[in-house]
């Protein structure tokens, strides 16, 4: 069975991006044993972040919207859903939500026998 590499390989990749080569010579090889890199200083104008997750804010920025939307299935129709907090969940268009609201208001205003 193949062994799963430890996190050392990830650290090596990370160190590659945090260091720059001390030599600009084109004759140096990438696999050189005598690699001497220097740590690139942090720019004072940039915010410091966890180096393992600096990219997360680009994809998972802080949202002002709630993460979860409460959606309940209508007991009358097994295919219709009601949104309780006004947010549209993925896969539903604003048009379909408005149609649902119109049909709900019509069913609520109809006289009962």
Curated annotation (Swiss-Prot):
InterPro entries: PPDPF (IPR026754). Keywords: Developmental protein, Differentiation. Pfam families: PPDFL. GO terms for biological process: cell differentiation. Probable regulator of exocrine pancreas development. Belongs to the PPDPF family. PANTHER family: PANCREATIC PROGENITOR CELL DIFFERENTIATION AND PROLIFERATION FACTOR. This is Pancreatic progenitor cell differentiation and proliferation factor A. It comes from Xenopus laevis. The lineage of its organism: Eukaryota, Metazoa, Chordata, Craniata, Vertebrata. The gene is ppdpf-a.
């Amino acid at each position: 069975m193949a062994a799963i590499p430890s996190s050392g390989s990830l650290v090596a990749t990370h160190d590659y991006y945090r260091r720059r080569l001390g030599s600009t010579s084109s004759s140096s090889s990438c696999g050189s044993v005598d690699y001497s890199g220097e740590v690139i200083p942090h720019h004072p104008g940039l915010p410091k972040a966890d180096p393992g997750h600096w990219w997360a804010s680009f994809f998972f920025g802080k949202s002002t919207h709630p993460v979860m939307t409460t959606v309940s299935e209508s007991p009358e129709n097994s295919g219709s859903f009601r949104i309780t907090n006004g947010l549209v969940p993925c896969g539903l268009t604003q048009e379909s939500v408005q149609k649902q609201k119109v049909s709900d208001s019509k069913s609520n205003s109809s006289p009962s026998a």
